[in-house]
């Protein structure tokens, strides 16, 4: 100690304090960099926040946010005639109300009835829609939470799960549950793995392709799970298996892949992902929310479809949406598990609640039994032959669209799509999208790389020639006006959003958009 004091006697106390503080701070940062697996992202956020708080910069940011909000709001229009911002003093007559709602429904229908919408409306046939509506109306008061009062709903639910399970070549131990949609199916699967492996790690991680559905990110944010995104091969756009294997560690509880993925319609190498899961004794989830009702039937029709389901050893769960290509009413999906023990990890039970014994398989307590009935009705009415017929039409239309895209100079298809989703890009792709929108098309804008995709539905069967014709014309219009491309529309928004390095800022603008979306166009008075 005396030697240390002699050595430091010539240093000013203030300098010693500052030096010590600096070394301590540097040590803390170094420790965080080593131990905090998301340190880089957190550091980037702090840097961008510091820049945005600088004088002058914050004003620019506010102005750009305001401009973006104005443009984003143009993307949705609401009829504010006969608006009800407070309860009417007297209830409106049923017949008058229905007439008003019919008029509004007609406006909505005009946006998709011409078959120019990617995904969204998957069938839209009047007779099938009528069946769904009648099935719902018969059980509109029912609730699966009360099985003794509504035993028929249990029949519809368990049989729907069984039909979907069988379609995906499930073995005898596979079980499942009905959910409200793909996001909930994925959420419940992730929750099940977290709880199933809780004795193994208290810092769970999942390893997934960067192209997997954002519902995995949502689930991990809610459930406090670290999500590790793996890049895809720049040619095939399938997940990089070497990188996936490298990312697995002692805290990894799950690997996952898509069949097909939402952005590009690519089927990940599920067999290789499942082998990794077996090797490391972890779960393997296949997200087939989009492809689950097309791929099995396309395979039967001898299209080149790789095996992606429970036939692969190591696949321990799957998600598939009945409300997409299962043609059920919006609000149903199925999550399947390889055994009952894994499914039980999904449940919530509250044995000590004063309100009685409470338990539920998924997130909601009460659920609309009418949707369960409509789901069952859709599956049973379509049957194997019905799904085969629709799958053939969808696959043939997709094949012709791919051929048409390949014939257009300057257009590049992303990867090698095997089913009904085709992503493509070209110069000024978002301006091309704006011109396609003016022709009535509703396509999906993508990023990384900037591109568009079309999800071919049964509603779009036979629309391939018009699609390619309109796309060629839109590309020509962009080329002809390349020196004076419009500053309005969605192209500037998408272009800037995809190129901005500050992703937190993009997230803020998206939150601004949601604010506008769920806020009344007119702020109601508090008086009635």
From Swiss-Prot:
SUPFAM superfamilies, sorted: PLP-dependent transferases
Cofactor: pyridoxal 5'-phosphate
GO molecular function, a single term: pyridoxal phosphate binding
Transmembrane segments: 13-35
Entry GO terms, CC: endoplasmic reticulum; endoplasmic reticulum membrane
Modified residues (N6-(pyridoxal phosphate)lysine): 324
Pathway(s) per entry: Lipid metabolism; sphingolipid metabolism
Membrane topology: Single-pass membrane protein
Reactions this protein catalyses: sphinganine 1-phosphate = hexadecanal + phosphoethanolamine
GO biological process: one example: response to cisplatin
Keywords annotated in UniProt: Endoplasmic reticulum, Lipid metabolism, Lyase, Membrane, Pyridoxal phosphate, Signal-anchor, Sphingolipid metabolism, Transmembrane, Transmembrane helix
CDD domains, sorted: DOPA_deC_like
Summary of the knockout phenotype: Cells produce short fruiting bodies with a thick stalk and drastically reduced numbers of spores. Mutant cells grow exponentially at the same rate as wild-type and are 25-fold more resistant to the antitumor agent cisplatin than are wild-type. Mutant cells survive longer in stationary phase than wild-type cells, but are effected at multiple stages of development. Addition of 50 uM extracellular sphingosine-1-phosphate to wild-type cells mimics the developmental effect of the knockout, and leads to increased cisplatin resistance.
Locations listed in the record: Endoplasmic reticulum membrane
EC code: 4.1.2.27
The protein's enzyme class: lyase
PANTHER family, per database record: PTHR42735, SPHINGOSINE-1-PHOSPHATE LYASE 1
Family: Belongs to the group II decarboxylase family. Sphingosine-1-phosphate lyase subfamily.
Known function: Cleaves phosphorylated sphingoid bases (PSBs), such as sphingosine-1-phosphate, into fatty aldehydes and phosphoethanolamine. Sphingosine-1-phosphate (S1P) probably acts intracellularly as a second messenger perhaps by promoting cell proliferation; the absence of S1P lyase increases its concentration. This leads to increased lateral pseudopod formation as well as defects in the efficiency of chemotaxis.
The protein's name in its UniProt record: Sphingosine-1-phosphate lyase
Organism name: Dictyostelium discoideum
Phylogenetic placement of the source organism: Eukaryota, Amoebozoa, Evosea, Eumycetozoa, Dictyostelia
Gene: sglA
């Amino acid at each position: 100690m005396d030697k240390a004091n002699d050595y430091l006697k010539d240093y000013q106390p203030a300098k010693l304090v500052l030096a010590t503080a600096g070394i301590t701070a540097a040590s803390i940062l170094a420790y965080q960099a080593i131990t905090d697996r998301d340190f880089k992202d957190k550091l980037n956020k702090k840097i961008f926040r510091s820049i945005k708080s600088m004088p002058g910069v914050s004003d620019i940011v506010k102005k750009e946010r305001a401009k973006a909000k104005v443009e984003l709001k143009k993307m949705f229009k609401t009829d504010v005639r006969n608006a009800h911002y407070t309860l009417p003093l007297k209830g409106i007559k049923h017949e008058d109300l229905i007439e008003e709602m019919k008029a509004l429904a007609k406006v909505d229908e005009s946006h998709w009835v011409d078959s120019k919408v990617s995904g969204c409306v998957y069938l839209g046939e009047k007779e099938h829609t009528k069946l769904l509506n009648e099935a719902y109306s018969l059980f509109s008061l029912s609730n699966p939470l009360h099985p003794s009062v509504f035993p028929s709903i249990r029949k519809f639910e368990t049989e729907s799960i069984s039909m979907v399970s069988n379609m995906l070549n499930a073995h005898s131990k596979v079980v499942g549950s009905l959910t409200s949609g793909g996001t909930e199916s994925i959420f419940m699967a992730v929750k099940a793995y977290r709880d199933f492996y809780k004795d193994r790690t208290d810092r769970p991680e999942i390893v997934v392709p960067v192209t997997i559905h954002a519902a995995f990110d949502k689930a991990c944010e809610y459930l406090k799970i670290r999500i590790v995104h793996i890049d895809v091969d720049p040619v095939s756009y399938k997940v990089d298996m070497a990188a996936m294997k490298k990312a697995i560690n002692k805290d990894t509880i799950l690997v996952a892949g898509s069949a097909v993925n939402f952005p590009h319609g690519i089927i990940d190498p599920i067999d290789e992902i499942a082998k990794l899961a077996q090797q490391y004794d972890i779960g393997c989830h296949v997200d087939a929310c989009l492809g689950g009702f097309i791929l099995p039937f396309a395979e039967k029709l001898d299209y080149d479809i790789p095996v992606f389901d429970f036939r692969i050893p190591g696949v321990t769960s799957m998600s598939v949406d009945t409300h997409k290509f299962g043609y059920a009413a919006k609000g149903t999906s199925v999550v399947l598990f390889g055994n009952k023990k894994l499914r039980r990890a999904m449940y919530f039970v509250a044995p000590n609640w004063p309100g009685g014994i409470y338990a539920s398989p998924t997130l909601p307590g009460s659920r609309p039994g009418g949707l369960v009935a409509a789901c069952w009705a859709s599956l049973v009415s379509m049957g194997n032959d019905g799904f085969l017929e629709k799958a053939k039409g969808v696959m043939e239309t997709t094949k012709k669209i791919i051929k048409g895209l390949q014939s257009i100079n300057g257009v590049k298809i992303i990867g090698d799509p095997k089913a009904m989703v085709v992503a493509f890009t070209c110069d000024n792709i978002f301006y091309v999208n704006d011109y396609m929108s003016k022709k009535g098309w509703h396509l999906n804008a993508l990023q990384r790389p900037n591109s568009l995709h079309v999800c071919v539905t049964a509603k779009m069967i036979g629309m391939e020639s018009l699609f390619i014709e309109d796309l060629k014309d839109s590309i020509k219009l962009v080329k002809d006006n390349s020196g004076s491309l419009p500053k309005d529309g969605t192209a500037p928004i998408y272009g800037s959003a995809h190129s901005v390095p500050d992703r937190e800022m993009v997230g803020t603008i998206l939150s601004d958009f949601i604010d506008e979306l769920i806020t009344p166009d007119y702020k109601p008075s508090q008086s009635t």
